[in-house]
From Swiss-Prot:
It is found in: Cytoplasm; Nucleus; Secreted. This is Glycine-rich RNA-binding protein 7. The gene is RBG7. Residues 8-86 form the RRM domain. It comes from Arabidopsis thaliana (Mouse-ear cress). Residues 83-103, 131-176 are annotated as: Disordered. Ubiquitous with strong expression in guard cell. One of its GO terms (molecular function) is single-stranded RNA binding. Residues 2-41 are annotated as: Required for RNA chaperone activity. Residues 97-148 are annotated as: Nuclear targeting sequence (M9).
């Protein structure tokens, strides 16, 4: 994809393990034309990692979906919906957390605590992965460099977060 292309993509977190691509698309189609819906699966087990992405045809549909779906129930779970960072932005995925991926609050985080992880220490699955994993988590602070995807993603990184985030970044010490 050329760097000038614009995608209207939402990050959807907190998904039930049973939610599939089709259920995700169906839930979001009421807001506009869905171009793509994708649940991210663990490459070793094939199971859902509890998050995914929905891409819309236009910006209005994306913004309406974020407004309408964030905090709503889908398949028995309250989901989080945010605008996804494009793959081309954020300086190529540099990870500024240093060391083990940006835990700053000592005991593994909690929602604020100076750049800790959104989901706490181990994510929502055994052995890391899931919504936050071991690699920093969602950080609303500029220097956090957090990782939505969690620590088990090859090469560290993960989705977005902080300055210099970037989807699928391979820089720095992110992850386990």
């Amino acid at each position: 994809m050329a760097s000038g292309d614009v995608e209207y993509r939402c990050f959807v977190g907190g998904l039930a393990w049973a939610t599939d691509d089709r259920a995700l698309e169906t839930a979001f189609a009421q807001y506009g034309d869905v171009i793509d819906s994708k649940i991210i699966n663990d490459r070793e087990t094939g199971r859902s990692r509890g998050f995914g992405f929905v891409t819309f045809k236009d910006e209005k549909a994306m913004k309406d979906a974020i407004e309408g779906m964030n905090g709503q129930d889908l398949d028995g779970r309250s989901i989080t919906v945010n605008e996804a960072q494009s793959r081309g932005s954020g300086g190529g995925g540099g990870h500024r957390g240093g060391g083990g991926g940006g835990y700053r609050s000592g005991g593994g985080g909690g929602y604020s605590g100076g750049g800790g992880s959104y989901g706490g220490g181990g994510g929502r699955r055994e052995g890391g992965g899931g919504y936050s994993g071991g690699g920093g988590g969602y950080s609303s602070r500029g220097g956090g460099g957090g990782s939505y995807g969690g620590g088990r993603r090859e090469g560290g990184g993960g989705y977005g977060g902080g300055e210099g985030g970037g989807y699928g970044g391979s820089g720095g010490g992110g992850g386990w």
